[in-house]
Every structure is written in C-alpha cells, then in structure tokens.
Amino acid sequence: AHSYGGVVLHDVINNTHAHKAIEKGADGLIAVAAGAGGHAGAKSPFALIAEIRQWFDGPVALSGAIATGQGVLAALAMGADFAYIGSAFIATDEARATPEYKDAIVAGNSDDIVLSNLFTGVHGNYLAPSIKAAGLDPANLPVSDPSAMNFGGDAKKAWKDIWGCGQGIGSVSKVQTTGEFVAQLKSQFEQAKAALV
C-alpha cells in the first residue's frame, strides 16, 4: 500500500501488537476491542485505547460493538480518531451478505453472539443461529487446536456459513441502504453530542 501512497492501518487486539505494528511500518492502528465481530480482541475499549494513546499519537480507529452514533461519539471521547463499524453495515442493502445473514443481525442482540476458536483456530465472535444451522450447539462448542488448522487456503472453508458478528447488533433494527444507515449514525451522533453540552 505504501508503494502507491496508501495508508496502512493495522488491526491490533492489545498494546503489544500495537507496538509491533507501528515498528513494522503501519501508519495507524485499528484497536479491535471486546465485542467486535469476527476475530475480536478481549480487551475493554477503555483500556485498549488508553494504553495505545500513552505512546502513540497517530491515527487510531476503535472497533468493537459500535453500531450507533452514540458509540461513534464514545469512541472519539475515549481517544480514537474515528470509529470502525462492521457488523451493522452487513445489514445494508449494498452488502453482499445473504438475506438470512442480514435478517439474523436484525433479529439478534448481544446474547446471540458466541465467542469461539473452533472455526479458524483464533477466537472470534459468531452468530449463534448460524452455528445452530451448521448442526452445532453454540453453548457446547469444542475448543480448537490452532496447530491443527489448515491456513493454506486449499481446502474449502467449512466455516463459510458461520457468520461473524459483533455484540452491537442489538441496535440494528432493520435492513436499510448504506446511505440511510450513515444518515442515522450522523443524526444519533449529533443528538448525543448536543445532549452533553
């Protein structure tokens, strides 16, 4: 990315990884905190941002259960330069997710999110309905041995229909266009900011 003038932001789940990412040449960081969809961190967003900001003043995004304008404002208040929203955008018309995936997000809440390392060998957050649809019990998933995982990319991904998702989905009430969702975020952000002053 640097060769064409691009900016590199590196996902990190803790302060150690943040240091390594900057040492290796990343321009900024995406602090992936607890509650994020897919491969999530376990750190509180408060702790993660505070630790990073003690030594790094470059661009930092915060990710993890952010699905509202209020969440964006909170991320900025904690010291992030911007918020990174993922799961809520899956439930937009433009997303290439299946209708079932989008509907599960709209119908779900944080209780429907399961943390497991079974599917990739790395802990991540997934939607319980997709785990059930695969014939597994979300409450009794075995622990994976990361050393036995095939990361070569040759085999078909058996977990392709296991849907990564963050804990912020309880704030997603409908499938809408990206433009409508962004307008909603802006309105919520402005209302939340005005309420603080």
Model-derived features with residue positions:
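Short beta-strand/loop segments at the ligand-binding rim of alpha/beta enzyme cores
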Residues: A1-I13, W55-S63, A67
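Short low-polarity hydrophobic stretches
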Residues: H2-G5, L29, T177
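Short, structured coil segments at secondary-structure junctions
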Residues: Y4-G5, K24-G25, F56, M78-G79
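General beta-strand structural signal in soluble alpha/beta enzymes
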Residues: H10-V12, I30-A31, L62, A83-I85
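Glycine/Thr-rich beta-alpha phosphate-binding loop at enzyme active sites
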Residues: D11-A50, T92, R96-T98
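Conserved active-site-proximal phosphate/metal-binding subdomains
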Residues: P45-A61, A67-V197
